[in-house]
Amino acid sequence: MRAVVFAAVGELTVAERPEPVPGPREVVIETAAVGICGTDTHVLDGEFEGTVFPLVPGHEATGTVVALGPGADEGPSALAVGDHVAVNPSSTCGECDLCLTGRQNLCRAWNGMGVVRADGAAQQRFTAPVANVFKLRPDTDVFEAALIEPLACAIHGWDVLPRRMADHVLVYGSGTMGLLMAQLAPRAGAASVTIIDVNPDRLVTAAQVGIEHRYTSAGDADRAEWDVVIDCTGSIAAIEDGLPRVMAGGVFQHFGVAPADATARYSPFRVYRDEVSVVGTMAVLNSFGRAVAMFETGAIKAQPMISHSFTLEDYAQALRMFRAGQGRKLQVRPNQDTSRTLLGQPGQRR
């Protein structure tokens, strides 16, 4: 079978790999779709701590169960051949203080599928433990459902935010994560949601998913301060613009991933005087099952967010397009033989 392989830092190839064989309590999944995100570029560029090469990328994955290992059809996580599924890519040691105190996402032995040591889903078929595999309803679009993994990250982002009913929320970045955080805001009790992006084309997507207040600069908005400000860009310029816009007693969240060696300037005195909270959020923590439930009950509008699908052979093209900030969510569909533009193409969703 065919797979994308990050052979070493900066080296990408498409290669033949052996067919996967499931171990105990594992299944083989035929990949339907796998989303491309910034983590994939960080991994290829050697910027993600602990990555072991060669590695098959791909951690935002859905597919169909095609084979069962011993015991995979037993217990509360039992699966069957033919099930459509979404896959939680995270695994942890389960033994360290962080794991034992409920902070598994911060485990120093965290192993993200397609990120650290375990091969990901940018291949025609892959294995996963049943504990990480979540069954989808038969009527759930298995391609759009590849947004469930980033949705699980967004739900955890809201979990760690101190908030009140009727807060006013400002989100920087109208990419995938910004759009998900903004769409969840009303369900988290927000009275209003404002989204900022320097790219007007991305604000068109924000309008399509229902975000009313959209600007290329926060200075153009109809408010000067917000209770909650969330940066989904990792841009130092956005962070430095956003922190002063937090209302007294409010909270600023670092959701986007800034470069590891980057620093931002802010006023410690203002944080002290106005009791501004600054919080981070990392990956998924007990939120994947909730993401499945929220996706399947229509919490987000997925269709406008996915613009292109690519074959395995066009993975490098997809990465170039992602780095250039073109399109919306880009997907690789390893078992399709044509790369396609999905938006504005009736009948082309699959």
Residue ranges and their predicted role:
Residues 84, 168, 250-251, 277:
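Short glycine-centered segments of the SAM/dcSAM-binding site in methyltransferase folds
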Residues 140-219:
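Mid-domain Rossmann-like dinucleotide-binding core that forms the NAD(H)/NADP(H) cofactor-binding site
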Residues 161, 204-276:
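Glycine-rich cofactor phosphate-binding loops and adjacent beta1-alpha1 units
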Residues 93-172:
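NAD(P)H dinucleotide-binding glycine-rich loop of Rossmann-like/cofactor-binding domains
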Residues 20-34, 48-97, 137-139:
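Glycine-rich beta-strand-centered segment in the early N-terminal region that forms part
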Residues 285-350:
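C-terminal hydrophobic helical "lid"/dimerization subdomain
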Residues 76-79, 163, 246:
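Short, well-ordered loop/turn sites that connect or cap secondary structure elements
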Residues 3-21, 38-67, 84-87, 107-119:
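N-terminal glycine-rich cofactor-binding segment
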